[in-house]
Amino acid sequence: MGKFQSKHAAAACKRRESPEGDSFVVPAYGSGRRGAEETDRRAGSGVEHRSRDKQELLNGDPKEGPFWDDKGSLEVVLPPEKSEGHEGQGQLFSTDDGEKAASREGPLRLSKKHLNIDALQCDVSVEEDNRQEWTFTLYDFDNSGKVTREDMSSLMHTIYEVVDASVNHSSGSSKTLRVKLTVSPEPSSKKECPLTGQDREPTRGRTEIELTDEPRVADRRLSAYSRKPNADPQPCSVRVPYCVDENTERRNHYLDLAGIENYTSKFGPGSPPEQARQEHHGRATHIPSRSRSQESDAHAIHHRRSQVLAEHVIPANEPATRALAAQPRIKGQEKQFLRSPKGPGKPLGTPGSGKPGKALSYCLQAVPLPQSAQDGHHLPQPPPQPPPQPYGHKRYRQKAREGHSPLKGHGQPTMVEHEVVRDLPPMLGPEGYVMPVVQRHEHHHHHEHHHHHHHHHFHPS
């Protein structure tokens, strides 16, 4: 968040120290000699010139030191556009944010009469690598197009901390930096920049067109506002700090970061927060809902499996009406299951749609199947319906074998066999015949070795 956003970060880190610092401290002590010295520095005087200028700034007394006498000729040269333009940063800031400038550097506004403020837009686009840019792209905090004062105050605290941390990396001197703060919701572009603590009320409705312009045009408007701050009723634009060309790539980069770094800080590097977090929260709620749908599928599989296993145990435990009530639901689920491509080679409880279903199926297989095996395998005639049991099994043997050979030959899903046998109970008459058929068919499908065991067991009878 406190990264240097200029293109040449490594090289410009040292080069931007002096212009950032002196451009704001300059108007405190005269203008002519400062402009000449700035012109010479831009023309390409060396690194030692910058370091001496920095020492001079840190000492706060520019007229001391021997090198001012050496540069006596430079005091006369005063190119108006570059020197005044660069001094214009200090003047623009003192005009824009008068209270803050007065608290930090009182005599900043003394040089107001020496400046030609028409050239203020020159310093916006001249030296890119001597500037440092922080872009805070803000979204709707509450999804209603309104930004409250609490949001803005916490945002300003965050911006102060970030800029302070970034500036301390580059220089130990006291600097006044200009931060361009734009609040832009998606439907209509707005600009909102209450920077000072005295005036933090957002001026939303009056400056909605600002952000749609190009950055240089917006900066030109800023210079116009600084020329006549009393004539224009928009204090927001007067207070917009740090005239920096908003790079389109950089802006898109921050917009891309908005979806990624949601939790770095409350107002992330171009992803502040609330709407991005709400989008993230929406995605997070979609993910649990998706997982809930998977859980519901797994629950349906578990329900299907438990119904099948309940049909194993029902002759010994519960009346047959529950199995009859459960048959249409299982039949509809099996018809759904027929259409899935993963169905053919897998048993009923493991359709491959979710690991919870598999785990539940295995647990159920481990727990109730021994009882069903005891009830069904070794006790071929359940206690409630002793007489119709063999008849139902003979009918079932014929139908099941007729159904198994063509269906398995074609590689159809195993649920088709179940549906073939499901169609048998209406022909079997009373409810007593239904239960053994379902029980034996499920036995035959899931445990074919038991089927052979039953076959040999029933064959003599």
Swiss-Prot record:
Domain notes: The N-terminal domain comprising the first 224 amino acid residues is mostly unstructured.
Biased composition, class Basic and acidic residues, residue ranges: 34-73, 97-106, 188-205
Organism phylogeny: Eukaryota, Metazoa, Chordata, Craniata, Vertebrata
Record keyword Cell membrane present: yes
Region Interaction with TGFA, annotated ranges: 307-396
Domain of life: Eukaryota
Listed name of the protein: Protein naked cuticle homolog 2
Residues the record lists as binding Ca(2+): D140, D142, S144, K146, D151
CC terms in the record's Gene Ontology section: basolateral plasma membrane; exocytic vesicle; lateral plasma membrane
Domain EF-hand: 127-162
Residue ranges of the region described as Interaction with DVL1, DVL2 and DVL3: 121-186
UniProt note on tissues of expression: Expressed in the cecum, colon, esophagus, ileum, jejunum, skin and stomach.
Keyword set includes Metal-binding: yes
